Amino acid sequence: YWPNDSNQPLKAGKWTVSLISELPAHEELPHDVHDVDIDRLSDLTIRRLVLTAPNASPHEITQLHFLGWKDHGPLEPIYILALMQAIRFLRGKRCSPLWVHCSAGIGRSGTLICAWLAQQLLPKKLHVSSGLELAAYTTAYVRQYRAGSVQTPGQMLTLAMAIESMRQNS
């Protein structure tokens, strides 16, 4: 999906993807940013890519490639929260779309998407819902658009624990 070498762009039809940089999170994220737990992101690589096509403006893409979450497996909630912190920092004030995808696009992706959505809902639902209730609510909502999201009980538990942690820190 992306080139491995900055000197060899990847071409697919009219599209060209060029690698600008590829760095581990601890080199890409500033160490003085208190909102990002860099130590939790040793399995995260951050790539800067540019997508171009003839007669079109180039699109800059920042890819976060996290290899520390096994397929169908749960993840300690602290890692999901650290990933979300890194995403927030790298997005800054931009309103560009956030794309999330794992191998099948539903288990790990769905868990992260639901955590992201729950974070947006927290100010409204903070005192009326438990972490598990919000996890069930966001999962049911996301499954309308991405069937099978949050594939395993372990992923649901991870999601509920991450949401509960967000509630406690709000």
Segments predicted by a language model, with ranges:
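Cysteine-based protein phosphatase catalytic domain of the PTP/DSP
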Residues: 1-170
